[in-house]
């Protein structure tokens, strides 16, 4: 099985998918430093033959048509302004019957989010859309909805636990601070506030081609 991880970062989800399911995973990320770190970490855990990384733009992916069985994206689409173009690309690289699974932060019913947030330090880097807008763009791309789950309440529980851990001085060596080296506490607090106040919501969804 061939899996594509869009916005693969330092490669944690890609390595997990490969290790747990035995699939071959290709990660794509626009940040060169993330791709280099992902390659180094993947080599250290012995998964380089299963997991590879490509530095590139998800809106214009360097892959052939119908190249993947699964496309995966975990909390990266908030930084992509042209989501319609992204979904067109996802449809293109997926094989018929292929699966697009993602987790994303969406705009809530209340005014703009508090910043800094985990996905953006300021509004200029944030491109949130509502659930309705996201679903409409996905449908227009030709992808078919199979599951759409609002996970906001679960996110709130996790965020409260993270906030409490930070308040207690818990700073694990391999924690979020590795990839979020600045404003970690402020981003944690704002993430919780945004969900509690209805400024954002979190969703997990599965679509098929």
Question: How should these model regions be labeled?
Answer:
Residues 84-99:
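A short glycine-rich, Lys/Arg-flanked "PGG" loop and its adjoining helix->strand segment in the class I
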Residues 4, 10-60:
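Class I SAM-dependent methyltransferase SAM/SAH-binding core
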Residues 25, 100-101:
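A short hydrophobic/small-residue beta-strand
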Residues 105-125:
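Short, glycine-/aromatic-enriched active-site segment of Class I SAM-dependent methyltransferases
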Residues 147-209:
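Conserved Class I S-adenosyl-L-methionine
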Residues 127-142:
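Short alpha-helix
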